[in-house]
């Protein structure tokens, strides 16, 4: 009988511990972190492969040659973008972890009646700092989203020409890389619908794959923007709660001091009356 009671108390203790642990998880920050990681993974992975596909298309179909020496050409820029992608992936992996840790600490401070004054003050400063950083990163991701839409637009034009090539058999339409700033203005790198290179481009899998990879990368950048907005809402709410916690803690301190003073006054008067009576 006693063993059964002990087992029941142990199970109850484990259940309460699990509930307490689950209650301390910052679910809003967790959702935003998952969305951020998904968006960054899609953008970085698909963007990297799309850039590699772009190099293949430029070399095989547009006959663009990599410049010799330290010349800054489109291939050099693509290599730079790839290194930027590596940095973005690493930076936002760390930033997501930091925001999750901040969410855990802030949620813990709020759960404990607003925690102790030093913790809530620190949490308030950290939340304010992260709000500023997240707002800057949101603007940066908006710029990345706008920039990623440019290759999507370019590939959409080529893909549309390939889809309608049978309708425009007698029309010779050309796609000039100079209008997108990919090659210098003095170099003429064009592909026309009546050209053999255009037929090879449309029949290859590189165009279709690269186009859709850029679309997925654009969707990933959009998901990262949504994650940043979500983080801003979470951080703003946490900052407001922690600010309220500081005020509540100050009120409790003032109230306890007043009660202590009243208690001391009553004690002093009681002693005076007792002394006067004796």
UniProtKB/Swiss-Prot annotation:
Keywords tagged on the record: Membrane, Transmembrane, Transmembrane helix
Record's subcellular location: Membrane
Lineage: Eukaryota, Metazoa, Chordata, Craniata, Vertebrata
Membrane-spanning ranges: 30-46, 84-100, 130-146, 213-229
Superkingdom of the source species: Eukaryota
Assigned GO CC terms: axonal growth cone; filopodium; neuronal cell body; plasma membrane
Record InterPro entries: Myelin_PLP (IPR001614), Myelin_PLP_CS (IPR018237)
Cross-referenced PANTHER family: MYELIN PROTEOLIPID, NEURONAL MEMBRANE GLYCOPROTEIN M6-A
Similarity comment: Belongs to the myelin proteolipid protein family.
GO BP: neuron projection development
Keyword Membrane belongs to the record: yes
Name of this protein: Proteolipid protein DM beta
Its membrane topology: Multi-pass membrane protein
Entry-linked PROSITE patterns: MYELIN_PLP_1 (PS00575), MYELIN_PLP_2 (PS01004)
Chief site of localization: membrane
Pfam family, one: Myelin_PLP
